[in-house]
Swiss-Prot record:
<dbReference type="InterPro" id="IPR035987">
    <property type="entry name" value="Ribosomal_uS8_sf"/>
</dbReference>
<comment type="subunit">
    <text>Part of the 30S ribosomal subunit. Contacts proteins S5 and S12.</text>
</comment>
<dbReference type="GO" id="GO:0003735">
    <property type="term" value="F:structural constituent of ribosome"/>
</dbReference>
<dbReference type="Pfam" id="PF00410">
    <property type="entry name" value="Ribosomal_S8"/>
</dbReference>
<dbReference type="InterPro" id="IPR047863">
    <property type="entry name" value="Ribosomal_uS8_CS"/>
</dbReference>
<dbReference type="GO" id="GO:1990904">
    <property type="term" value="C:ribonucleoprotein complex"/>
</dbReference>
<keyword id="KW-0687">Ribonucleoprotein</keyword>
<protein>
    <recommendedName>
        <fullName>Small ribosomal subunit protein uS8</fullName>
    </recommendedName>
</protein>
<keyword id="KW-0694">RNA-binding</keyword>
<comment type="similarity">
    <text>Belongs to the universal ribosomal protein uS8 family.</text>
</comment>
<dbReference type="GO" id="GO:0019843">
    <property type="term" value="F:rRNA binding"/>
</dbReference>
<dbReference type="GO" id="GO:0006412">
    <property type="term" value="P:translation"/>
</dbReference>
<dbReference type="InterPro" id="IPR000630">
    <property type="entry name" value="Ribosomal_uS8"/>
</dbReference>
<comment type="function">
    <text>One of the primary rRNA binding proteins, it binds directly to 16S rRNA central domain where it helps coordinate assembly of the platform of the 30S subunit.</text>
</comment>
<dbReference type="GO" id="GO:0005840">
    <property type="term" value="C:ribosome"/>
</dbReference>
<keyword id="KW-0699">rRNA-binding</keyword>
<keyword id="KW-0689">Ribosomal protein</keyword>
């Protein structure tokens, strides 16, 4: 049986690995997950990512986490907003700020998967995938 929400699975794996200070975490490969990883890398929340093959030949997205020191984490929390049972869409002029601009919302738009700031600049709306701070 297939997975219902690969994005929520990815965010949960990153959140759990982050809490125990893992250097990297393997997540399910999907195009949207790769695009979310690109945005997280660009905004500085993760160190990087790679697409590798597992022993069965399936693609796996390996996300490299980063930490400022041994006690603190860069990602305080990462939450799914739009879910399969309740999609959340925003218009270009109605995009809310996450923690008054401190955090980042990742939005799937017609211009690709971008941050809330980029969506506001381009005045495009879309589906709010998740929030990170």
């Amino acid at each position: 049986m297939g997975m219902t929400d690969p994005i929520a699975d990815m965010l949960t794996r990153i959140r759990n690995a982050n809490r125990v200070h893992f250097k990297s975490v393997d997540v399910v490969y999907s195009g949207v997950n790769v695009n979310i990883a690109k945005v997280l890398k660009k905004t500085g929340y993760i160190g990087g990512y790679d697409v590798k093959k597992d022993e069965k030949g399936h693609d796996v997205l390996k996300v490299y986490l980063k930490y400022p020191d041994s006690k603190r984490t860069i990602i305080n929390d990462i939450q799914r907003v739009s879910k399969p049972g309740r999609r959340v869409y925003v218009k270009g002029d109605e995009i809310p700020k996450v923690l008054n601009g401190y955090g980042v919302a990742i939005i799937s738009t017609s211009k690709g998967v971008i941050t809330d700031k980029e969506a506001r600049e381009k005045s495009v709306g879309g589906e709010v995938l998740c929030k990170v701070w």
